[in-house]
Amino acid sequence: MPDILFLLQGARNGWPVSLAAPFPESCDEANWLANEEKFGCTLALSGQTAKTIVPVGSIEFVNQYLSQMGLGPMEAMNIPPELEQEQFLGRRIFRDVSKTELSRLRAEFGPLLLKPGRHPKRFEAIPHEERLLGEIPDNELLFVSQMIPSQFASEWRVFVSRGRVMDIRPYFMEHWLAPDAAVVHDMADTLREHPALALDVAVLLEGGRTVAIECHPFIACGLYGFEGPKMVSMARDAWLGELRRQKSHLLGHK
């Protein structure tokens, strides 16, 4: 019996969805290196057991599993407070903003980008335009950021485990420009209290500055080619961290 069993979301063709596809071979590699069966994968829980079951797939898939456990949904990470430093962001950000506050912020700080403040992917990031506000649920507090004035030359996803960079993958390229390594490692170090996450950074076309775009829990997270033993260990750690967060939240409301 493995310590960790990854419950993979299946596609209609019977194969794992793209988010989960790297897990079987990555688990095999991790087990081979450890010379023991630490990780397993399944598309269905049919009598299989493990110390910990970790769902892998879309946000909806993971939230459904959390609901079956009697827990709440995942929360949006956006920019963790530790990362809220001008040297990393190059812009102002605002948390827990209601739709009624947007006009005032727009008048004072210029063009704005709006994201869900609590529920990841409840709607896609959109610019602040009156005609688009109807797409935002009235009960969703917003994460708002100033628009970065420069275009992006490149965007990268940095995989961070307890403050250490495990891997980095490009996901948008106007020009092949890698981010400033020292800046990225400094960003990662500020996030050392998080067991595992993905940090998106951009290299600005004008001036080449490296800035943080947003963070994601390493759950229901696009991998862009990241795989192997580090990946499965991070997925385990992120899930256990989510369970601890939810337990702490429940205890705080008793």
Language model feature labels by segment:
Residues 58, 227-228:
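Short, solvent-exposed helix-helix connector turns and helix-capping sites enriched
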Residues 118, 148, 203-205, 217-219:
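Short, flexible loop/turn elements at secondary-structure junctions
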